[in-house]
Amino acid sequence: EPPSEFINKNLKELNLRAKHNVHIIAIKERSPENFMLVPPADFTIKSDDILILLGKTDDIKKIKALKQ
């Protein structure tokens, strides 16, 4: 699940590329069941979404650490 600070924000607001040096290349929604490649900037993240990230391992680990 996404870090709580990501929930109910759209990708443009999060600006992950500039802030964390990672890209969201896909999102798997659980409700409704959907897999979206290259989600649009206005996509709003929900608590049960699964984010597929592209970036350096250390940068992705930093995103994962936000969940703790």
Regions found by a protein language model. Give the residues of each.
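Cytosolic Rossmann-like ligand/nucleotide-binding regulatory domains
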Residues: P2-K67
